[in-house]
C-alpha cells in the first residue's frame, strides 16, 4: 500500500462570505448614506473561485441576491453602479454568467479579452501576471519600451470600458509608482499600510 497524505478541512460556520464580508459591508453602507466609505466611490469585492465553477456560482448567485440592494447590477445593455461591485476571478463560470439577463457580478478577464468580443458589462476587469508581460522586477531601469507597453495595455482596456489589475509582480514601491503613473486601476499588494502611505503621498 502506498503512503498517502490526507488533508482534513474544517469549515468554521462563522467564516462565511456573508459573515466576513457582505454583512459588514452592508452595515457600513447603511451607516454611511449608501456608500462603504461616506462620500466615497464604489467599493469592489473580488471573489476568487477555487472550486468547480458552475456549482459555486449557483450558490454565490443565491447569496448575492440577498444583498441586491447594495450591489452593482449588470445586464446586456447597462450597468447600474451601486455601493459594492462584485467581480469574480479564477475559475469563474463565464458561459453561465453570460446567459443571465441580469446579474450581481461581473468577470475578471485576461489579456485575450482585449482582443475578443466580450462586453465590458460581462468582463469588467482585465487582470494579468506582471511577470509574464514585463521583464522589469522593480530594480534598475524600467525601459521606455516596457513603459510604453504598459501604458498601451492600460489605455486599450480603458478605451473598452474595462479596469486593469496586475498580479504576481514584485510588491515594491517602484512597481506601484509605474502602475499608478500608467493609470492601472487596482494595485495588488500584501503591504496594505505601506501602499496606503504611498498613495496618500503621491499626487
Protein language model regions, located:
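Catalytic cores of phosphodiester-bond hydrolases, prominently lipid phosphodiesterases
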Residues: 2-203
Amino acid at each position: 500500500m502506498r503512503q498517502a497524505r490526507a488533508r482534513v478541512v474544517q469549515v468554521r460556520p462563522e467564516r462565511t462570505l456573508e459573515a466576513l464580508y457582505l454583512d459588514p459591508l452592508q452595515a457600513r453602507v447603511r451607516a454611511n448614506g449608501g456608500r462603504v466609505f461616506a462620500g466615497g466611490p464604489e467599493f469592489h469585492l473580488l471573489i476568487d473561485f477555487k472550486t468547480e465553477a458552475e456549482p459555486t456560482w449557483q450558490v454565490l448567485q443565491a447569496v448575492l441576491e440577498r444583498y441586491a440592494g447594495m450591489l452593482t447590477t449588470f445586464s446586456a445593455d447597462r450597468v447600474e453602479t451601486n455601493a459594492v461591485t462584485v467581480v469574480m476571478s479564477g475559475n469563474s463560470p463565464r458561459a453561465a454568467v453570460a446567459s443571465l439577463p441580469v446579474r450581481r457580478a461581473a468577470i475578471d478577464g485576461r489579456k485575450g479579452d482585449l482582443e475578443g468580443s466580450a462586453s465590458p458589462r460581462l468582463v469588467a476587469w482585465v487582470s494579468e501576471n506582471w511577470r509574464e508581460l514585463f521583464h522589469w522586477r522593480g530594480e534598475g531601469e524600467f525601459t521606455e519600451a516596457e513603459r510604453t507597453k504598459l501604458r498601451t495595455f492600460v489605455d486599450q482596456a480603458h478605451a473598452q470600458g474595462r479596469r486593469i489589475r496586475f498580479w504576481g509582480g514584485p510588491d515594491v514601491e517602484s512597481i506601484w509608482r509605474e502602475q499608478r503613473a500608467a493609470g492601472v486601476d487596482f494595485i495588488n499588494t500584501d503591504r496594505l499600510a505601506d501602499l496606503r502611505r504611498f498613495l496618500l503621498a503621491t499626487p
